[in-house]
Amino acid sequence: MSRARAVKKNSLVDAVVVPVGAVGRFGAFAALAGVAAMRLQWSVAEAIRHAGVLAMRCLIPVCATIFPFGAVIGVQGMAIFDLFGAHRLLSSLLSVVIIRELGPVLAAVLVAAQGGSSFAAELGAMRIKEELDATAVMAVDPVGWHVVPRVLAMVLVVPLLTILADAVGVFGGYVVAVGMYDQDHGVFMAHLVQLIGVYDLFASVTKGLVFGGLVGLIATYRGFHASGGAEGVGRAVNDTVVYSVMFILVVNYVLSSAMFGSGS
């Protein structure tokens, strides 16, 4: 009994200590990346190159995903609003749901799946091949040279894709409302801007910035600390996608509560 109790106690301790240690290591890694960025220990050309590749890889998936979301919201919204004779309010619903929430969240999730996994795989392969150690031996900061450009690429690309996702998602709803349900174009556009202002667009882009930094740090952290050969790289890629999606949703709730919780 005492041995079983000891095993149970150790398991409980591990369940608490291991996550806390992981959070601490991630925080230290993020701090190192921030210091390297402020000291300009990174290549602008590399950041731009990564941003270009990331944007091209994620452009079509973002558009192809957000458009049907907007269309589905349009179909369901018209079905509900028609019960009250208020179908003209569909564009107001679209603008709030997509611009405030779905646009930045879906853009970040797809970038995490497409670009974050790629960054984790690249850095994981470098770690396994000891290329990161070789960079340090050459008196070059591996965090500044390999991590910071990728994180900055995420911070740059996710807000841009968020703006695109907002526009494409609203257009998906427009196609349904005007093309399928014959809603007047002027009515749709008038109510589109009724509940959305500059603050909402700013909030959407701000979410994109935060999500981009979060995904970039998670992806580079998992890849940078990969171990165990090819299997370890695979785990790093899988963890990147899972943790990124999880924290995007949690942080989105926090940001939405802070930005819109007072009824703004």
Feature locations, PLM:
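Hydrophobic alpha-helical transmembrane segments of multi-pass membrane transport proteins
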Residues: 90-133, 161, 215-218
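Final/C-terminal transmembrane alpha-helix of multipass membrane proteins
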Residues: 233, 239-256
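Short cytoplasmic-facing helical segments at TM-TM junctions of multi-pass membrane proteins
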Residues: 123-148, 230-233
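Active-site cofactor/substrate anionic-group-binding motifs, chiefly glycine-
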Residues: 50-106, 110
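Generic alpha-helical transmembrane segments of integral inner-membrane proteins
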Residues: 63-71, 125, 155, 159, ...
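Membrane-interfacial helix-loop-helix connectors in multipass membrane proteins
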Residues: 76-100, 167-209, 213, 217-237, ...
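Short, membrane-interfacial amphipathic segments enriched in basic
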Residues: 2-47, 222-227
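Selective transmembrane-helix segments that form parts of the transport pathway or gating/packing helices
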Residues: 55, 59, 63, 102, ...
